Amino acid sequence: MCETCKGNYYITTPIYYPSANLHIGHAYCTVATDAMARYKRLQGYNVKFLTGTDEHGQKIEDKAKEAGVTPQQFVDNIVLGEKGVLDLWKLMNISYDRFIRTTDDYHVAAIQKIFKKMYDNGDIYKGEYSGKYCKPCESFWTESQLVDGKCPDCGREVQDAKEEAYFFRLSKYADRIQDLLENTDFLEPRSRVNEMVNNFIKPGLEDLCVSRTSFTWGVPVDFDPGHVVYVWIDALFNYMTALGFENDKYNDLADFWPADVHFVGKEIVRFHSIIWPAMLMSLGLPLPKKVYGHGWLNFNGEKMSKSRGNVVDPYILSERFGVDALRFFLLRTFPFGSDGNFTNELLISTINTDLANDLGNLVSRTTAMSQKYFGGDLGVGGEHAPLDDELKALAEEVMANYEKQMDAFQFSVGLNEAFRLISRANKYIDETTPWILAKSEDTKPRLLTVMKNLCECIRIAAILVSPIMPDSAKAIFDLLGVPEEGRGWNARCYCADKDAVWKTSTGAPLFPRIDMEKELAALEELSKPASTIEIEPYAEEKVDFDTFCKSDFRAVKVKACVPVKKSDKLLQFTLDDGTGTDRQILSGIAKFYKPEELVGKTLVAITNLPPRKMMGRESCGMLLSAVHTEKGEEKLNLIMIDDAIPAGAKLC
C-alpha cells in the first residue's frame, strides 16, 4: 500500500444466483457498490471490490437437466455467455477488483475445510431434517412459518422434505446475535434491525440445516459421501475465500478482512445479519464491520420478478439512454435503504430534467460562451463581486454535505447536494448576464471572472458525480481542459481567482433530450413478453367424495384489504361472508396484487378451516386461487366470481 493511501477498504455485493440472466434489479445493487468503490478510490483508499456468482443448488441442477446440459455448462453459459453476468458488468462499467464463482476449485476446497472445522468444534452435528422446502429460495421452513401453506419469502409452493442432514447450532448464538444487532451499528438501515430481532430472533432461532442428500450439485462433504454442503456455508464464506481464507489462491485476507460493508438486498438481510455472523463467531473470526440492506426496485408499483413478466432489461435501457444516464437514474431517484418504483416515464423525465436541462445545459452554455467571448482561453485576470463569495460558500457547503451523505451510503441525497450547486450555477448565469457583460470592454474583466466561476462550479460538480457517472465526468473534465491533478478528491477546493486559467472546448450535447412519447412506445414494443404460457402437468391425487364435502366453500365480498406491516408477502382481508360478522383472512399474495384493486371483488373462500396465527394476526380461512407457470415461473390469480352472487352463498 502506497504511503499516500488512506488505508484499505473492502466492499462486496451479494453473489448472484445464475438460474437465469440478471436484470436491472441485480444491476441496482452492483451499480451502488461500484459507486461506493469509486468514491473510496477517489478519496485515496486502496479498495478491494468483490462480486460474483452463487452457482450450486437444486434449482441449478434441475434447470440444467431441463436444458439437457450439465450444471457446470448451465452456469458457464449464464455467467460467461453472451449477455451473461460478466457481459452485463462490463456494459454497466462495473469496476470490480475480483470476481468469485462458487464453482472455482479453490473455493470448493476451502468450503470443505471450513465445514470440517465447524464439525470438529461441535457446532455442526448430524441429524435428520423433516419439514417444508422451497426450491426457488433454497430455504427450509417449519409448518408454522408458512404463509397460506406457501413459502413466506416468495409465496411459492413448498414441498415436503425429509432427509439425513448436518445442522449448524445457530440457536447457540442467538443472544450474541441479538446483542450485536441491538447494540451496535452492524446492520443498517436501523429498520432492518427491528425486522430481524422481532421476526426471527425473539420467536426463537432454530438450528440450521447445512447439508443436503437429495441432490448432488454442490460442494461434497468430503468425510461423509452423499452429503453436499448447503448454500449457507458455501455462499456466505465467499467473502473470505476470495481473499485467501483456507486457500493459497490469494493472500490479502489480512489486509482486507473484516469487510467494511456488505451491500445486500433486503430479502437476504437475514442470512447476512444472523447466519453469517453466527458462523464467524463459531470459528472465532472477526465480523464484517457493516451489513447494509437496500430496498427492492419495483416496476410500476409491483415487485420486479420474472414470474410477472415485468423485469427490466438493462441492455435495452443502456442502448437507448446510455450507461451513465441509467446509473445516475438508479442512484439519484431511489433512496438506497428504501424500495423504489421504477417506471420508464420516471427514467426519461429524470434524464431530461436533471441531465439534459440542468447539468448538460450548464456545461453547454458555459463552454459555448467561453468559446464565443474568449475563444476558449480564460486567462489570468478578472473582477470579483460579492455574488461570487456566495457561490463559493455554497460550493464548500455542498462538498461537505456530499461527503457526509456518501459515507452514509445515501447516494440520492449526495447527488441532491451536487445538483444544488449545478442549479445555483445555472441561476448565476441569469443573475450575471454574460451576454450583456460581453457588449463592453469595460465589463470584460467581470465577464472573465463569471466564466471562471462557472467552470469551477462545473469542475467540482464533475468530481462529485464521477463515482456515479465516470465517463460523463471525464467528458466534462475534457471539455473544460482540466488537468489530471484537478480531477481528484484533493482538488475539490473552490478556486476561481485571478490566477486561475482555463482552456475550454465545445462538443455535442452530453445528454440529448429524449422524446417521451416516442421512447415509451419503443420501450413497450421492445419489452413485449412472449405470449406462450406453459401449464405444468400435475400428479392427480384421488380424494373421496365425503372428504371433499367437508370443505365449506363460500362467496365472500372484499370490504377492505391492506398490507401487513413487516411482511412483504401478506395482505389482510376484511370480508363479508354473509354471517353479519366480518371475517379476517390473511393471504400471501402481495406480490401478485395491489390491495386497492381487490376491494369490492367477490372471491371464494374455504370458511371452515381452523383459525391460525400469521405475523401475530388471526386468519380464519383460505382464499382460492389458480396457479400456472409462465416461462418456468409461477403466476397466481385469485378466483373471482360474479358480483351478483351474494356474500355467504355456498359453492358446490
What are these regions (language model features)?
Residues 290-293, 477-479, 572:
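Beta-strand segments within the central parallel beta-sheet cores of soluble alpha/beta enzyme folds
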Residues 476-549:
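Intrinsic disorder at enzyme termini
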Residues 2-74, 78, 100-115, 120, ...:
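N-terminal catalytic cores of NTP/NDP-binding nucleotidyl/phosphoryl-transfer enzymes
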Residues 126, 132, 338, 346-384, ...:
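Helix-rich, typically C-terminal accessory recognition domains appended to large enzymatic cores
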